[in-house]
Amino acid sequence: GYIEIPVTLIKEKNIKSNMYLSLLSKTLGIPSLQKKDIQKVTTSINDEKKVDFDNNWSCGVSNALLIFINKKIWQEQYESKDQDLGLFKFSSLEKIKANNNWTASLPKKENINIAPLKNGDKIKVNGNTIKVSEIFRNYGIKNVLKEVWPVVSIGDEVYWVPGIRKSDSLIDYEKSGKSNIITASIEKS
């Protein structure tokens, strides 16, 4: 459900970019990209907007990468409670060497929910409650990637945005020394 390609490889209209677009269409399950599909890709690159294709794939630009995401596949993975969510892999650990935004010590007996961003999701950071969408914007996570990036909540409270930010509640809990360590990583293949 995730494909990325550097924008520079397909921005120029030449034989190489056509080859990459052809490879891309096969990977997306589109027999061949039609003119309208190529225009959608061009619009996404030039206007930095999200565009949708007919087969559940969407694309957008983030950090000079053209990113294609199949939200249906991601949603199925979220619903199956799988440990792999798109390009994110979650695992439990007994100990860690370094504590950073890719690890979190979460309360063991709580119902931990990992899901994509929902409208109105907020996180408490440095005593202030701010929208998670604002956190994404500040870290350059936009378009299609923002729609599938995991958000970890306990009840209605957002505790952790993996790789980006921990809430004040999570930071306080981690200071207690209790451990139910979950680590997140990005694994591209």
Where are these regions (language model features)?
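AMP-forming adenylation/ATP pyrophosphatase catalytic core
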Residues: 1-189
